[in-house]
UniProtKB/Swiss-Prot annotation:
This is Dermonecrotic toxin LsaSicTox-alphaIB1bii. GO terms for molecular function: lyase activity; metal ion binding; phosphoric diester hydrolase activity; toxin activity. Its EC number is 4.6.1.-. Its cofactor is Mg(2+). Dermonecrotic toxins cleave the phosphodiester linkage between the phosphate and headgroup of certain phospholipids (sphingolipid and lysolipid substrates), forming an alcohol (often choline) and a cyclic phosphate. This toxin acts on sphingomyelin (SM). It may also act on ceramide phosphoethanolamine (CPE), lysophosphatidylcholine (LPC) and lysophosphatidylethanolamine (LPE), but not on lysophosphatidylserine (LPS), and lysophosphatidylglycerol (LPG). It acts by transphosphatidylation, releasing exclusively cyclic phosphate products as second products. Mg(2+) binds at residues 25, 27, 85. Expressed by the venom gland. It comes from the Eukaryota. Binds 1 Mg(2+) ion per subunit. Signal peptide: none annotated.
Amino acid sequence: WIMGHMVDAIAQIDEFVSLGANSIETDVSFDKNANPEYTYHGIPCDCGRTCTKWEYFNTFLGGLRKATTPGDSKYHEKLVLVVFDLKTGSLYDNQAYDAGTKLAKSLLQNYWNKGNNGGRACIVLSIPNLDHYKLITGFKETLTKEEHPELMDKVGYDFSGNDDIGDVAKAYKKAGVTGHVWQSDGITNCLLRGLDRVRKAVANRDSSNGYINKVYYWTVDKRASTRDALDAGVDGIMTNYPDVIADVLSESAYTAKFRIATYDDNPWETFKN
């Protein structure tokens, strides 16, 4: 999965997919009542990027739905996965459940079209704080209450705080999550980060009793670091330059082992090294 980083304006969906992304990451900020409000990152952000592009969250979902609904004039067949980077740092811990509830209602209405031919991409809820695991509970219980529990088949999870792998496992246990787990590891492109924790995450994925299904590394903009991440066995790379990742994947060293995921590839299924 080539994951376009910080796609916060509808116009950027076309831009990143045309550069080779089959997945995008979108920032979601919340108001003080835990309503998802904007797709917005803000300053500071990655080096070389404009930090202030934004839409209202529900407006963005409408654009995303069009981009992932077959037959729509804006449809992109290859856009199959969306990571929502949920900026829950502005919330109190006890608002996490409400945030999950409100997020589910927004997606149900504006992305899934109440279960009637909505957008088809799979969604990863990426949460920065392990203490906010109840966001998952709120999300799940709301879809059940709204009589669309089947949409949970399209939803996965990520805790993005670079926490100890054992602590992440405990948070999932509390949330009752037993699959659909992506594990991120990374840092802004302005700084360097080694691959030690990525290797631990890959080892967990590849073990018989691990909780991780997929591992992605962020934010990778250079060919050398792309090769290092692929050599470590990641499933996804988040980048500001999807064309760079696509170029490296076309090198002879990688074409035999990796291919770009399509809609038919299950993003919750584990492939071991």
